[in-house]
A protein has these predicted regions:
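Short amphipathic alpha-helices and their capping loops
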Residues: 1-34, 59-103, 126, 182-251
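Acyl-thioester-dependent acyl-group transfer interface
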Residues: 3-25, 29, 33-42, 54, ...
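Active-site-proximal acidic secondary-structure segment that organizes catalysis
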Residues: 11-17, 129-185, 442-458
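AMP-binding/adenylate-forming domain of the ANL superfamily
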Residues: 14-31, 106-111, 156-157, 249-265, ...
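Flexible, Gly/Pro-enriched loop and linker segments at secondary-structure and domain junctions
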Residues: 38-43, 71-76, 118-132, 172-180, ...
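Hydrophobic "lid/gating" helix adjacent to the active-site nucleophile
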Residues: 61-76, 268-315, 460-467
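Acyl-thioester-dependent condensation/acyltransferase catalytic cores
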Residues: 65-145, 150-154, 161, 165, ...
Length: 476
């Protein structure tokens, strides 16, 4: 990949590169449904109890930044190419140390959370920051605020794991982590795909797929159903999509901590009955959506995909996330186990063709359906974060660890569900981020959560239970 010579505002010439499709989508979504700079913030912290060496952590962070090229990513405006990206070869990053030991835990949490709500100047400026934290209750660790055009949830976790491994190498002689992979190699792979036979094959597949499928159906998470209202408003009794994307971005979170016992019950059922964890979680979610929509059998969920299968993709950082609709039509006579197979089959179709650019995918989908850009058949987005082991000094330190994702108070998604595992005990943390522009959203999301996990636990306890029995138990 030949670099593009780009000129910065100070006259300096840098080697720059085009944006990937995933980055272009982030810009598209931000410009159309975001526009508040903090919308692109990822704020997260990892904290633990026990002996903590601040200076060794400072050294580890500095090495981690040098090893992870996307932390040093910058963007520049170019008259010919629009927005380009370039890497600062060496950065003297300011690693601030913050002492909150004199505060309560809640006071500290609110202050740290407020950092995540502050946007940064985008072009030709550092986009990512990291702080060494000393918290109440004997907790120490690191907080990062990263830009979503430079990191996604997966690469954020890998970056933190790399720093913690370097720290343990310095502190107790643990093995030094293997090298990270070059970010630009991943960019090259993404750009090469666009001109590849595989891209042409994927496009042909999706064209045929949409032409041979019936129109999907919008299943709302609001009890004041938007589809029913739009059918009346537009005098379209057969309408199956909704106009629900707006530039109102203010959001809040509802967070639920599922017990280690219940989480282990779900994982055990998956292992014993050969069900995928993400399939079981999605079936619980689709069951709750079905219950909210008069037991609708045709449910679509927008699934966020990390696209990190190769070593290069796992260790190169950056943002590779794309999202695709996973549609499942499940009749009530199917068992829970059989219904997971329906979801997994639909999900596998997406996985095999998930490198195709999402915006082009939406165009192909809408070209054979009635929805247009800004209208959707998916009421929410779901992301499952499989466990990524973070290194700790010993089991006691690991048990004390706390990982926190701080809401930036802004979202481009109407409803975004993330389910991840706690480092301390591997239990599920369930994070619902909802927008404030819909009355009653918080109450409805809380009800949706209860019904989702009731369905999940019923299926984990008895994978042979009928879907109709689950819907009877979780009906509104």
């Amino acid at each position: 990949m030949e670099p593009i010579k780009a000129q910065l505002s100070n006259g300096q010439i840098v080697d720059a590169y085009p944006l990937t499709q995933a980055q272009q989508f982030m810009f598209f979504a931000f410009n159309n449904y975001g526009q508040v700079p903090a919308t692109l913030n990822i704020g997260t912290g990892e904290y633990w109890k026990g002996d903590f060496d601040t200076e060794l952590m400072r050294e580890a962070i500095a090495e981690g930044i040098e090893r992870t090229e996307c932390f040093r990513l910058r963007f520049v405006k170019d008259q010919q190419y629009g927005t380009l990206q370039y890497i600062v070869p060496k950065t003297e990053a300011v690693i601030e140390e913050v002492d909150h030991t004199g505060l309560t835990y809640d006071e500290s949490y609110e202050i740290i959370k407020s950092w995540s709500t502050v946007g940064v100047e985008f072009f030709e400026k550092p986009l990512n920051t990291i702080k060494i934290m000393h918290l109440p209750e004997g907790l120490n660790g690191i907080y990062v605020k990263l830009n979503h055009v430079t990191f996604d949830g997966y690469s954020t976790k890998i970056f933190l794991a790399d720093i913690m491994a370097i720290y343990l190498n310095k502190k107790v002689g643990a093995p030094y982590p293997k090298p990270m992979k070059p970010y630009l190699d991943m960019v090259q792979e993404e750009l090469d795909y666009l001109n590849s036979d595989k891209c042409k094959e994927d496009q042909a597949f999706w064209i045929n797929f949409f032409q041979t499928q019936s129109e999907p159906y919008f299943c709302d998470y609001l009890r004041d159903n938007r589809l029913m209202k739009e059918r009346v408003e537009y005098n379209q009794p057969d309408r199956r999509y909704v106009q629900c994307f707006t530039q109102k971005t203010e959001s809040r979170q509802l967070i639920y901590h599922i017990s280690e016992e219940d989480t282990n019950a779900v994982l055990a059922a998956c292992n014993e009955r050969d069900m995928s964890v993400v399939g079981v979680l999605m079936l619980g979610l689709r069951s709750a959506l079905s219950a909210f929509n008069e037991r609708q059998e045709d449910v679509s969920i927008r699934l966020m995909l990390a696209r990190r299968s190769t070593l290069l993709e796992k260790k190169s950082g950056g943002n590779r996330w794309q999202m695709f609709s996973v549609r499942s039509i499940v009749d009530e006579d199917k068992t829970f186990k059989e219904a997971t197979e329906v979801i997994e089959k639909s999900r596998d179709v997406v996985y095999h063709h998930c490198n195709y650019p999402f915006l082009k995918w939406v165009y192909l989908k809408n070209s054979v359906n009635k929805a247009t850009l800004g209208q959707t058949y998916d009421s929410l987005t779901f992301s499952y974060h499989a466990p990524i082991e973070l290194p700790y000094e010993n089991a006691e330190v690991k048990k004390s660890s706390i990982g926190i994702w701080y809401n930036n108070n802004f979202s481009m998604q109407n409803l975004y569900l993330t389910i991840k595992h706690r480092c301390a005990d591997n239990g599920f943390d369930v994070i619902w981020e909802y927008k404030l522009d819909e009355d009653g959203a918080a109450e409805d999301v809380a009800i949706l959560h209860d019904k989702m996990f009731k369905a999940i636990m019923m299926g984990a306890k008895n994978p042979d239970i009928k879907i109709g029995e689950i819907l009877d138990a979780i009906k509104l």
